[in-house]
From Swiss-Prot:
Gene: nad4L
Membrane topology, record value: Multi-pass membrane protein
Class of the enzyme per the UniProt entry, highest EC level: translocase
Gene Ontology biological process terms, A to Z: ATP synthesis coupled electron transport
Name of protein: NADH-ubiquinone oxidoreductase chain 4L
Organism of derivation: Dictyostelium citrinum
GO molecular function: NADH dehydrogenase (ubiquinone) activity
Amino acid sequence: MNLIDLILIAIYVIGISGLIFNKNNIINILIISELNLGTLGMLFVLASVELNDILGELSGLYILTFTAAESAIGLAIVVILYSKTGIINIRNLNKLKG
């Protein structure tokens, strides 16, 4: 394990602690999930380079695609939530019914 791996693991742990302690704002949750998935993708790519295997790089590409779709859907939900309630709070998601 080298220094870059340790830094990425530390960033991932910081992101998980951010999810645990900050559950009210949906924008912060989206940013933290992007951070976590980005670090996981980088860890997969670094592991594939160290092991000389292509599957880690493909997994990193899949994670990158998934995070792009997640952010697009999440931002669409945020826009709809703000237009309906005027507040971006996770507790107001039940007001988006039908």
